[in-house]
Structure formats: structure tokens, C-alpha cells
Amino acid sequence: MLENLATTLADTLEGIPVLSLLIIIPLIGALAAFFLGKNNAKLAKSIALAFSFVALVLSALVLIAYYGSGNGGFMFSENYVWVEQLGINYNIAIDGLSLPMVFLSTLLVFLATLFSWDVSEKTRTYMSLMLVLEVGVLGVFMSLDYFLFYIFWEIVLIPMFFLISIWGGPNKSYASIKFLIYTHVASL
């Protein structure tokens, strides 16, 4: 019965750009938390938690559909030409290696958002950065194009720098600069 449910779910999700939705949902949440939570920290937290939960549920559905289908290769593939002259495509998919990382990333962002409920300094910025970080991490794990991978990798570095430099520990300034230097040098 569970196998039939997974197969039905896989068939249902196959025609939907589910992986793009996994990237877009946290991005919309980040924008909503930042702009709608301007004067209300609790609203910003609630928006971030809701959007991270939706991404978690969607990744769980993809996980069930993938492993229930018995497919061992790429699934839910999306490929759109982006810059044809340079051979750059928006090409994303998941496989048995990337899917657990996608699911764990959505789970960790949801839990991090939930357990950082007591953040009181620049709350809307913090919650927005968490969701932008989720966008970048999910893109890194789902990218099949090197240029797209690099873009998502750089997207991860920006919110991480600000999260460390604003909400970090006692040596947050030193740590954030070191993080920025090492990760940017490594990304070249």
C-alpha cells in the first residue's frame, strides 16, 4: 500500500516543477518575512517558520516519491536554456545522493528557525537570511550545471557572512572576515 502511494505521488509530482518550487518557496518567504515583518518581529518569525515548514513538507513528499518509485537515477529534472551562447542552463534534478541532503537541509532550516524564536535583534533580517541560506543550499544540492552551482554557492556565502557577523559569538567580526576570505578564495 505504501509503495502504491509513493508511485502515485511520484506520478503526480512528475509534471510539476517541484524542485523549482523548493527553491522559490523559501525565497518568497524571505521576501515576505523581510517586508511584512518590518514592524512586527513575531510576524517575521511566523512567516519564516511557515515557509520553512512548507519547504520541509514538499521535500518530504519528494523523498517519499523518489524512494517509492524505485528509480535509481535523476528524477524531477528541470532543464531550461539560460545563456545559450555560453552553454549555461538552469538544470536541476535530484538523485539518491542529493535528495537526503535536500531533505536534511529543509529539516535543519525549519528546526533552526523554530529554535531561534528568541532572537530579538534585527529579527526580520535574521529570519530572511535563514531562508535565503536555504535557497542557496537547496540550489547547491540540486544543480546539474556548473555555473548554476557556482551562483547558488555564492548565494550561500552572503547570508552566512551576515549571520556570523551580526549574531555570532564574541569574535564574530574576526570569524566573519575569515569565513569570507576562505570561502571566496576556495570558490575560485
Spans of model-derived segments:
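Alpha-helical multi-pass transmembrane bundles of energy-transducing inner-membrane proteins
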Residues: 39-41, 125, 129-132, 136-188
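N-terminal signal-anchor/start-transfer transmembrane helix
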Residues: 21-38
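Small-residue faces within membrane-embedded alpha-helices
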Residues: 24, 48, 106-109, 134, ...
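Short conserved micro-motifs on helix faces and helix-strand junctions that flank
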Residues: 23, 92-93, 106, 142, ...
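Alpha-helical transmembrane segments of multipass membrane proteins
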Residues: 30-35, 60, 110-114, 135-139, ...
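Alpha-helical transmembrane segments of multi-pass inner-membrane proteins
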Residues: 21, 25, 50, 100, ...
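Transmembrane helix-loop-helix hairpins at membrane boundaries of multipass inner-membrane proteins
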Residues: 1-18, 36-114, 121-128
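Membrane-embedded alpha-helical segments of multi-pass membrane proteins
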Residues: 24-28, 54, 152-159
